[in-house]
UniProtKB/Swiss-Prot annotation:
GO biological process: cell differentiation; negative regulation of activin receptor signaling pathway; regulation of BMP signaling pathway
Molecular function, one GO term: activin binding
Top-level taxon of origin: Eukaryota
Signal peptide location: 1-29
Subcellular localization: Secreted; Nucleus, Nucleolus
Encoding gene per record: FST
PROSITE patterns cross-referenced by the UniProt entry: KAZAL_2, TB
Protein's recorded name: Follistatin
Positions of glycan attachment: 124, 288
Species in which this protein is naturally found: Bos taurus
Quaternary structure note: Interacts with GDF11. Interacts with activin A/INHBA. Interacts with myostatin/MSTN.
Every TB domain range: 30-103
Ranges where the Follistatin-like domain occurs: 94-117, 167-190, 244-268
UniProt function note: Multifunctional regulatory protein whose primary function is to antagonize members of the transforming growth factor beta (TGF-beta) superfamily including activin, myostatin, GDF11 or bone morphogenetic proteins (BMPs). Mechanistically, binds to these ligands in the extracellular space, blocking their type II receptor-binding site to inhibit downstream signaling. Plays an essential role in muscle fiber formation and growth both by preventing the repressive effects of myostatin and through SMAD3/AKT/mTOR signaling independently of myostatin.
Length: 344
């Protein structure tokens, strides 16, 4: 009886399939990472079992890849104890085909590695002078503000042209916005709501720091914009003829502080912990005492139950920064933080 012969073609086909399987397996054996750290290791695991081509197809500049096919325990040790995965291969070695997004460009750094840096298009900017940003800081020009927005403040915008001011004098707000001065005597441009709906409940009434009852928060905002100086909220409900803080009920964990200058009380948030920062600027308060910071002044006010406000920055022995603004800044009773204007 004749033995069956092995077909050489079938054996070759089997070997080809085995090689293809091994090739596919090796192609899927790598790990994809979102960045390469300064120590040269891969960090922030994106996905396992990806080929280099698949990993690098994301187009991210910082994406990197490791070839090692390791278990979960090894990956955990790399990420937690070793500062990342070794043998890290960056997807991008040059700036070719790198898309950094709007306002950024790819440039080779001193170590000859591609990096996305802020490079806003400033060619269409006509005003070359300083501008005041929405963060209350002065920038030497609008291009410098755009760079700051690119780096760390995506919501940063130009409020008005020129340096940030302590008064609304000479502040020209764009569009329909109006200049308002906050508690720290910084000028901001805000949009006034000219139409307020009629209140539907008596619980909407608010007592302003000017002793006037407002039908709603919208009406208080509107009055603030028309005045050009923040009025502020004394307490919720209609204003009453209080003889002391004992007559005023504060809500939301606030404490009543008495303003002896006008004979009225207002509810203030106390219990704030002052940061131990040497960068805080001292302030001269309405009691003619110098405090290490505005926070320290508020802490003293909460402790005594007497309202204190900032007269000017710096020591009480120093001269106020803007003597020309004394006339406009004399009525501190109309002040409260600008954030309150924007949040309501």
């Amino acid at each position: 009886m004749a033995r069956p012969r092995h077909q050489p073609g079938g054996l070759c086909l089997l070997l080809l399939l085995l090689c293809q399987f091994m090739e596919d397996r090796s192609a899927q054996a790598g790990n994809c990472w979102l960045r390469q750290a300064k120590n040269g290791r891969c960090q922030v695991l994106y996905k396992t079992e990806l080929s280099k081509e698949e990993c690098c197809s994301t187009g991210r500049l910082s994406t990197s890849w490791t070839e090692e096919d390791v278990n979960d325990n090894t990956l955990f040790k790399w990420m937690i104890f070793n500062g990342g995965a070794p043998n890290c291969i960056p997807c991008k070695e040059t700036c070719e085909n790198v898309d950094c997004g709007p306002g950024k460009k790819c440039r080779m750094n001193k170590k000859n590695k591609p990096r996305c840096v802020c490079a806003p298009d400033c060619s269409n900017i006509t005003w070359k002078g300083p501008v005041c940003g929405l963060d209350g800081k002065t920038y030497r020009n609008e291009c410098a503000l755009l760079k700051a927005r690119c780096k760390e403040q995506p919501e940063l915008q130009v409020q008005y042209q020129g340096k940030c001011k302590k008064t609304c004098r000479d502040v020209f707000c764009p569009g329909s916005s109006t200049c308002v001065v906050d508690q720290t005597n910084n000028a901001y441009c805000v949009t006034c709501n000219r139409i307020c709906p009629e209140p539907t409940s008596s619980e909407q009434y608010l007592c302003g720091n000017d002793g006037v009852t407002y039908p709603s928060a919208c009406h208080l905002r509107k009055a603030t914009c028309l005045l050009g100086r923040s009025i502020g909220l004394a307490y919720e409900g209609k204003c009453i003829k209080a003889k002391s803080c004992d007559d005023i009920q504060c809500t939301g964990g606030k404490k009543c502080l008495w303003d002896f200058k006008v004979g009225r009380g207002r509810c203030s948030l106390c219990g704030e912990l002052c940061p131990e920062s040497k960068s805080e600027e001292p302030v001269c308060a309405s009691d003619n005492a110098t405090y290490a910071s505005e926070c320290a002044m508020k802490e003293a006010a909460c402790s005594s139950g007497v309202l204190l406000e900032v007269k000017h920055s710096g020591s009480c022995n120093s001269i106020s920064e803007d003597t020309e603004d004394e006339e406009e800044d004399e009525d501190q009773d109309y002040s409260f933080p600008i954030s309150s204007i924007l949040e309501w």
